[in-house]
């Protein structure tokens, strides 16, 4: 249940969802939440391969313009990759009505949500406030397993985060991920953990309830 008196809709999309279509949907949904016509929502999906540029992205951080489609967005952050094998989570919550008008706390709670979920699969990770994301130590290196990029309109959140489940990590070669030169990425599969999306999603929902519905 939502703290607002009606359920948070939990939607899982089958197949690939076009990135621009997802942007249009989120814009419409935020309008509906603000106007009281629609409920808050958590949307789980996959995108076809795409590079997305947040409001802080710099041209020099796009290393290959022709590798995949490039879409500029209104979310925070820099360049990121979305594609098959990655669980994308878009979170549309009304922080104003929840009396939680604290952006840093919201982002930190997203991080705790991911860290708690990964722990259920035996993965020790941590959320980094400075280099926003969830990181693991692997082969003596810090590697990012989840990337974050949010937007907020009149205290309704949208966009969210992505977790690499079985992502082709070579797809990151065309960008400087999140603008952090020399950074490395990983996935559950890369860490030797095989998890079906359905199982991962179930734990995500359980952990969401413990963090956001208390």
Curated annotation (Swiss-Prot):
Active site: 178
Biological process terms in GO annotation: protein modification process
UniProt GO cellular component terms: cytoplasm
Domain of life the protein comes from: Bacteria
A GO term, aspect molecular function: lipoyl(octanoyl) transferase activity
Residues engaged in binding substrate: 75-82, 147-149, 160-162
Signal peptide: none
Entry EC number(s): 2.3.1.181
Catalysis performed (reactions): octanoyl-[ACP] + L-lysyl-[protein] = N(6)-octanoyl-L-lysyl-[protein] + holo-[ACP] + H(+)
Xref: InterPro entries: aa-tRNA-synth_II/BPL/LPL, BPL_LPL_catalytic, Octanoyltransferase
Keyword set, alphabetical order: Acyltransferase, Cytoplasm, Transferase
Intracellular or extracellular location(s): Cytoplasm
Domain BPL/LPL catalytic residue range list: 36-214
Pathway note: Protein modification; protein lipoylation via endogenous pathway; protein N(6)-(lipoyl)lysine from octanoyl-[acyl-carrier-protein]: step 1/2
Site feature Lowers pKa of active site Cys, where: 144
Family: Belongs to the LipB family.
Protein's job: Catalyzes the transfer of endogenously produced octanoic acid from octanoyl-acyl-carrier-protein onto the lipoyl domains of lipoate-dependent enzymes. Lipoyl-ACP can also act as a substrate although octanoyl-ACP is likely to be the physiological substrate.
Matches recorded under PANTHER family: LIPOYLTRANSFERASE 2, MITOCHONDRIAL-RELATED (PTHR10993:SF7), OCTANOYLTRANSFERASE (PTHR10993)
Miscellaneous comment text of the record: In the reaction, the free carboxyl group of octanoic acid is attached via an amide linkage to the epsilon-amino group of a specific lysine residue of lipoyl domains of lipoate-dependent enzymes.
Name of the protein in its database record: Octanoyltransferase
């Amino acid at each position: 249940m939502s703290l607002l008196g009606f359920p948070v809709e939990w939607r899982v999309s089958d197949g690939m969802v076009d990135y621009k279509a997802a942007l249009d949907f989120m814009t419409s949904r935020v309008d509906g939440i603000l106007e009281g016509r629609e409920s808050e929502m958590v949307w789980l999906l996959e995108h076809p391969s795409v590079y997305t540029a947040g409001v802080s992205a710099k041209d020099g951080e796009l290393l290959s313009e022709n590798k995949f489609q490039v879409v500029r967005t209104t979310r925070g952050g820099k360049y990121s990759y979305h594609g098959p094998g990655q669980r994308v989570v878009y979170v549309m919550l009304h922080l104003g009505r929840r009396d939680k008008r604290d952006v840093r706390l919201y982002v930190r709670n997203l991080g705790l949500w991911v860290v708690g979920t990964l722990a259920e699969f035996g993965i020790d990770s941590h959320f980094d406030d400075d280099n926003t994301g969830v990181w693991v130590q692997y082969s003596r290196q810090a590697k990012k397993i989840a990337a974050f990029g949010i937007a907020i309109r009149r205290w309704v959140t949208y966009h969210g985060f992505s977790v690499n489940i079985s992502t082709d990590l070579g797809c990151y070669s065309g960008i400087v991920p999140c603008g952090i030169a020399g950074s490395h990425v990983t996935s559950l599969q890369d860490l030797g953990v095989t998890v079906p999306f359905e199982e991962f999603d179930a734990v995500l929902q359980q952990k969401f309830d413990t963090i956001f519905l208390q």
